[in-house]
Amino acid sequence: PGMSPERIADRLHGFMRELGYERYGVQGGDWGGWIAPLIARRHPESVVGVHVNFAMGAPSEGDPTEEERAFLDFRTRFDRAETGYSWIQRSKPQTLGYGLTDSPVGLLAWILEKFWAWSDHGDDLFETFDRGLLLTNVMLYWLTNTVTSAARIYSERDRTPRPVERLEVPVGYAKYPREPWAAPRSMVERAFNVVRYSEPARGGHFAAMEQPELFADDVATFFSSLP
């Protein structure tokens, strides 16, 4: 309890300082797409740049553009059909945790369903992801008994105010085609100082695992462009 995204951001900054880095870059997808910008907001003097492949951006104060409206309509449908997991993790993480820590099959299903729903895999998940890599991902939660604490971040986020100021630290935004939370560039630019924008040809929510070479190249290109 109490391990909010803000606290995680401060912990990660502290780790970098302990390692001797006065200035560093951060990258984030999924929850990292939330926490990486928080590190820059809370410690802007230390962060040279932020690269994200998950960004919901900020809505327009006026009428949304056609692209923004299409995204918002999609998100309304998507949230209704695909975010039940989020609501239970936000409201009852401890209750859910008892079930998932007691059943390896239940934990496997809970996690792999998201790989299926959110990735760019066609109709064969194992053409995109190595089976061993997926099992390793699940086992990290199982062997360490941490699925409950991982779920609690959803609840902790709701207890803290969300940032409203535009982030002025340089940001690189990679908009992958099968990322459900990939907001249009215009929305992201309202929230962040986007100095590099890219649309990789393939990839989804788990871009670093799905397309590691494309992902690494995009991240490296962004940071190499910074002064």
Feature locations, PLM:
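Residue-level signal for the nucleotide or nucleotide-sugar donor/cofactor binding architecture
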Residues: 3, 7, 207-210
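Conserved acidic catalytic loop of the alpha/beta-hydrolase fold
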Residues: 6-24, 34
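The feature captures the conserved acid-bearing segment of alpha/beta-hydrolase catalytic domains
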Residues: 8, 15, 66-93, 163-166, ...
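Active-site phosphate/pyrophosphate- and oxyanion-stabilizing loops and adjacent acidic/basic residues
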Residues: 13, 37, 186
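Acyl activation and transfer enzymes in specialized metabolism, enriched
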Residues: 18-19, 28-29, 33, 208-214
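Conserved hydrolase catalytic core segment
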Residues: 21-70
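C-terminal subdomain of alpha/beta-hydrolase-fold enzymes, centered on the catalytic histidine
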Residues: 89-227
